[in-house]
């Protein structure tokens, strides 16, 4: 009887995994689902010879944005129609965002980046050095990438960001290089977005590094969030400034909107249901935020002069009507010098620490990105 049970176990196990036969067609089984504690748009299921990764469509949540089969070995897999096959580990990738290039640096996989778009936004010294040495090729603008250079780079995957109603990715969809659709920015929470590093770590062959880093981020973030809960002040806060004739503000359910709540700041649009940004006229923001205690903004300074409240007022004559400008409680991040965009999407604990330092000065925390704008 025992021998019969053992034989059945071996038969079932061998059948379900398909062995290591070259060219084996893998039947879809239930697999082992990797539990995501925070990410809502990402599902990862481990099968015998591959991981199945499904990305939910952030704008049509009942539909999938993309499905990947990430092979565990060089064995050939026969994938269903509409599924993208990725052979890991990826050794040659092109990133269309400094966000994901910055993460690959954190995962010690920066040497696998062979090209980037929008190099003028790069701040990380490892990336700048690789560009200088010719190890990373300038792929042009993210909106109009240099297709010839991408092909010449022999990239195994392109890390791109999906947008609602964008109409696709243009010519890069036709060159036969898999597109990794990085929808992490649409996660409603900071830790949800950061948890996507598990997917990117899987692709790059850096799973353990990604798991370890996420555990570190989660622990630090939750510690800071708990500290903020114990503070007494709840300052109101407004965010960013005019871009042309429009004021773009993060929605109340956006990553930043939720993070402001985690810092125990009362965001003026906290009740808004948008997870992305909203485009508002100046008059609307003035009505809603004129009495806000704190004004947070991102700006690009001029090398010739420091950015001051006078500089800010020169950009729009109505800024002096805000209480935060009048009392000098404006805090800015100089994106020309700062690594805010390269670091904070996957190190939200760094950002939360800054917010707590501003909202609760009694914490005596030092700032990493945001500093008081002087007159």
Predicted regions and their residues:
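Bacterial Sec-dependent N-terminal signal peptides
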Residues: 1-25
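Bacterial Sec-exported substrate-binding components of ABC uptake systems
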Residues: 17-101, 209-238, 326, 339, ...
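A short, structured surface patch at a secondary-structure boundary
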Residues: 51, 59-63, 69-151, 156-162
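Short, structured coil segments at secondary-structure junctions
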Residues: 109, 175-176, 263, 326
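Extracytoplasmic substrate-binding proteins
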Residues: 135, 154-246, 270-271, 329, ...
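A ligand-binding cleft/hinge motif common to bilobed small-molecule-binding domains
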Residues: 164-174, 299-312
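Flexible, glycine-rich surface segments
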Residues: 224-309
